[in-house]
Amino acid sequence: MPELPEVETVKRGLIKTIIDKKIFDIEINTDKLRYPIDKDQLVKIKNKVVKEIQRRGKHLIIFIEDDLQLIIHLGMSGIIKVIDSTNYNKIKHDHIVVTLSDNLSLVYNDPRKFGYWLVNTNHTPLEHRVLVSHGVEPLTADFNSDYLVSKLKQTSRKIKQTIMDNNIVVGVGNIYASEALFDSNILPTRASNTITKKEAANLVSSIKKILEKAITQGGTTLKDYKNTEGKPGYFTQQLNVYGRNEQQCYVCNTKIQSLVIAQRNTFFCKKCQK
């Protein structure tokens, strides 16, 4: 699933290519992604200009003139490509194709159809039902040790579950949660309310560092993810624990272990993490 760094990479690619472009047409090739597609709403973006693009957690928000916003989630396997319209040949799972000025097309391909495209018309996209409960952004000053400690002391659930809770902090997905916990030497199975303030400070620092490094590498490609140019992310080459079950830890040579926490595969080093 595309996580925060991957969505941030897509956002930056879109900013470079589609800002100030006019939307000439939108072709919808499916009736349903995660939610049924409201074609009457989507056609409202036709003949409008793209003004701004933001990210909120794992969502893209595309601001369009006349106070319209597209809220897009890539789901498990969604890819957005910006290509030359004259060279476009439709392939399987191209569910939405937006034709833009300057011979550009924005193509949304999603084999598993867990993503969604929603149109917001009330001028306040952050109050939309899919965004309103989001917690703080991890790369902002609002995400700090005092904030995290205040949340951790309220729950005994495993620390990995807590830092992946979008109501607390958005966008720290499965890959980066495992990597940040390794970087801060904290076992993913620790009860949240046992984490000390010093450990919380280290964890906040690790989350920020890991996410920022992943963004500079264009995200992580395990299977499906590609950026707007169709290129993979290269952070896979820097993963210390994720996906490395039974391989030697780069730090201590102990074998990496895995277990399932809240239905998500979790990777850790029993020696380095306490």
From Swiss-Prot:
<keyword id="KW-0479">Metal-binding</keyword>
<keyword id="KW-0511">Multifunctional enzyme</keyword>
<feature type="active site" description="Proton donor">
    <location>
        <position position="3"/>
    </location>
</feature>
<dbReference type="InterPro" id="IPR020629">
    <property type="entry name" value="Formamido-pyr_DNA_Glyclase"/>
</dbReference>
<dbReference type="GO" id="GO:0008270">
    <property type="term" value="F:zinc ion binding"/>
</dbReference>
<feature type="binding site">
    <location>
        <position position="93"/>
    </location>
    <ligand>
        <name>DNA</name>
    </ligand>
</feature>
<comment type="similarity">
    <text>Belongs to the FPG family.</text>
</comment>
<dbReference type="GO" id="GO:0003684">
    <property type="term" value="F:damaged DNA binding"/>
</dbReference>
<protein>
    <recommendedName>
        <fullName>Formamidopyrimidine-DNA glycosylase</fullName>
        <ecNumber>3.2.2.23</ecNumber>
        <ecNumber>4.2.99.18</ecNumber>
    </recommendedName>
</protein>
<dbReference type="InterPro" id="IPR015887">
    <property type="entry name" value="DNA_glyclase_Znf_dom_DNA_BS"/>
</dbReference>
<dbReference type="Pfam" id="PF06827">
    <property type="entry name" value="zf-FPG_IleRS"/>
</dbReference>
<dbReference type="Pfam" id="PF06831">
    <property type="entry name" value="H2TH"/>
</dbReference>
<keyword id="KW-0227">DNA damage</keyword>
<feature type="active site" description="Schiff-base intermediate with DNA">
    <location>
        <position position="2"/>
    </location>
</feature>
<dbReference type="GO" id="GO:0140078">
    <property type="term" value="F:class I DNA-(apurinic or apyrimidinic site) endonuclease activity"/>
</dbReference>
<dbReference type="InterPro" id="IPR035937">
    <property type="entry name" value="MutM-like_N-ter"/>
</dbReference>
<keyword id="KW-0326">Glycosidase</keyword>
<feature type="active site" description="Proton donor; for delta-elimination activity">
    <location>
        <position position="264"/>
    </location>
</feature>
<feature type="active site" description="Proton donor; for beta-elimination activity">
    <location>
        <position position="58"/>
    </location>
</feature>
<dbReference type="InterPro" id="IPR010663">
    <property type="entry name" value="Znf_FPG/IleRS"/>
</dbReference>
<comment type="function">
    <text>Involved in base excision repair of DNA damaged by oxidation or by mutagenic agents. Acts as a DNA glycosylase that recognizes and removes damaged bases. Has a preference for oxidized purines, such as 7,8-dihydro-8-oxoguanine (8-oxoG). Has AP (apurinic/apyrimidinic) lyase activity and introduces nicks in the DNA strand. Cleaves the DNA backbone by beta-delta elimination to generate a single-strand break at the site of the removed base with both 3'- and 5'-phosphates.</text>
</comment>
<dbReference type="InterPro" id="IPR012319">
    <property type="entry name" value="FPG_cat"/>
</dbReference>
<keyword id="KW-0378">Hydrolase</keyword>
<feature type="binding site">
    <location>
        <position position="112"/>
    </location>
    <ligand>
        <name>DNA</name>
    </ligand>
</feature>
<dbReference type="InterPro" id="IPR000214">
    <property type="entry name" value="Znf_DNA_glyclase/AP_lyase"/>
</dbReference>
<keyword id="KW-0863">Zinc-finger</keyword>
<keyword id="KW-0234">DNA repair</keyword>
<feature type="zinc finger region" description="FPG-type">
    <location>
        <begin position="240"/>
        <end position="274"/>
    </location>
</feature>
<dbReference type="InterPro" id="IPR015886">
    <property type="entry name" value="DNA_glyclase/AP_lyase_DNA-bd"/>
</dbReference>
<comment type="subunit">
    <text>Monomer.</text>
</comment>
<dbReference type="Pfam" id="PF01149">
    <property type="entry name" value="Fapy_DNA_glyco"/>
</dbReference>
<keyword id="KW-0862">Zinc</keyword>
<keyword id="KW-0238">DNA-binding</keyword>
<dbReference type="GO" id="GO:0006284">
    <property type="term" value="P:base-excision repair"/>
</dbReference>
<dbReference type="InterPro" id="IPR010979">
    <property type="entry name" value="Ribosomal_uS13-like_H2TH"/>
</dbReference>
<dbReference type="GO" id="GO:0034039">
    <property type="term" value="F:8-oxo-7,8-dihydroguanine DNA N-glycosylase activity"/>
</dbReference>
<keyword id="KW-0456">Lyase</keyword>
